[in-house]
Amino acid sequence: MERRTRQKRAIEAVLEKHKNPLTAPEILRLALKEIPTLGIATVYRFLKSLTKDGRVVSVEIPGQMPRYERADKGHHHHFLCRACGGVFELERCLAGIKTMAPPRFRVEDHEIILYGSCETCLRKEKRASQPLVA
């Protein structure tokens, strides 16, 4: 039986609290508030264990380091903001996506990533483009 140390509880709390998938360095930064001595190696080891046990899944986005989120969230997709690099959950899935496969093919899984700008970055962009009033 695996010991539930303070470090592990802090990592689990970060994953529980944050809706969006996080990189290991992001998890470390957030967990350091609770455990100042926590190291990145511990974070990676525990994420590997959680992934192996099926409690956490890795979110793979091309050109980025893996992100991690709880496995109990069910099937969903992600949105990558090209301006800030943030990754956000999409709550819905395309209806009928499995019917897009060619005849006599079987879809076993799929993953969709939308790319663009998040609400915060769009607001910043809009403010930056507004002329200064003299």
Model region roles, listed by residue range:
Residues 57-58, 62, 66-134:
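Non-DNA-binding regulatory cores of transcription-related proteins
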